[in-house]
Amino acid sequence: MSRIDGRTPEQLRPITIERGWSKHAEGSVLVSFGDTKVFCTASVTEGVPRWRKGSGEGWVTAEYSMLPRATNTRGDRESVRGKIGGRTHEISRLIGRSLRAVIDYKALGENTIVLDCDVLQADGGTRTAAITGAYVALADAVAWAQGRKLVKAGRKPLTGTVSAVSVGIVGGVPLLDLCYEEDVKADTDMNVVCTGDGRFVEVQGTAEAEPFDRKELNALLDLAVSGCDELAVIQRAALEATTR
């Protein structure tokens, strides 16, 4: 099958993860999945929410938003509308859950890390790009906290890596990492979050048109795992590179 951008069914879009995009944030990344671009920052603060105080455990949370012209038509800022949309809440919670899956709260100590993921340009897969980029920003923020002795020596707050990718069935063919044009044509689409050792954190799947069977589900999950494996390699390479 020939895809819109010439990729094979099992091929990711070109992925880049550029660290050090903010001079202020303890961790920052511009992540690109093809034409989808998300700016992720990680901010470290000493202390935890009231309900966490005295536990000796840290906390990680996330917020997600889109710039007004991230899509082909301008959307009002949610701050202007005076209400955060349900989709925004859902994706923010998804990003937070995904990152907390690889955090050792005790090792983090009573510190809070907030990930802010802002979509600069959307062409499908914004939430999966946000998770993948936010992990790298989180890793840099953790390293910063360790360097400032906010995290006790010898402790490792990160227990592994986490990344995410979209998969879907378009024209009867399972595809990896859908762009927007593929996403709107998909009979089935799914977002899959995996740890670096191949375990699932979250699987969000919906039949948009035709219901899917177990064989198709397995094919999509296999595609997603292979995609997340590739993303984990890209994340590691980004973290090993020297920031500018």
UniProtKB/Swiss-Prot annotation:
It catalyses: tRNA(n+1) + phosphate = tRNA(n) + a ribonucleoside 5'-diphosphate. Phosphate binds at residues 87, 125-127. InterPro entries: ExoRNase_PH_dom1, ExoRNase_PH_dom2, ExoRNase_PH_dom2_sf, PNPase/RNase_PH_dom_sf, Ribosomal_Su5_D2-typ_SF, RNase_PH, RNase_PH_bac-type, RNase_PH_CS. The keyword Transferase applies. This is Ribonuclease PH. It comes from Streptomyces avermitilis (strain ATCC 31267 / DSM 46492 / JCM 5070 / NBRC 14893 / NCIMB 12804 / NRRL 8165 / MA-4680). Its EC number is 2.7.7.56. GO terms for molecular function: 3'-5'-RNA exonuclease activity; tRNA binding; tRNA nucleotidyltransferase activity. Pfam families: RNase_PH (PF01138), RNase_PH_C (PF03725). GO terms for biological process: rRNA catabolic process; rRNA processing; tRNA processing. Homohexameric ring arranged as a trimer of dimers. It comes from the Bacteria. Belongs to the RNase PH family. Phosphorolytic 3'-5' exoribonuclease that plays an important role in tRNA 3'-end maturation. Removes nucleotide residues following the 3'-CCA terminus of tRNAs; can also add nucleotides to the ends of RNA molecules by using nucleoside diphosphates as substrates, but this may not be physiologically important. Probably plays a role in initiation of 16S rRNA degradation (leading to ribosome degradation) during starvation. Keywords: Nucleotidyltransferase, RNA-binding, rRNA processing, Transferase, tRNA processing, tRNA-binding. It is an enzyme of class 2 (transferase).
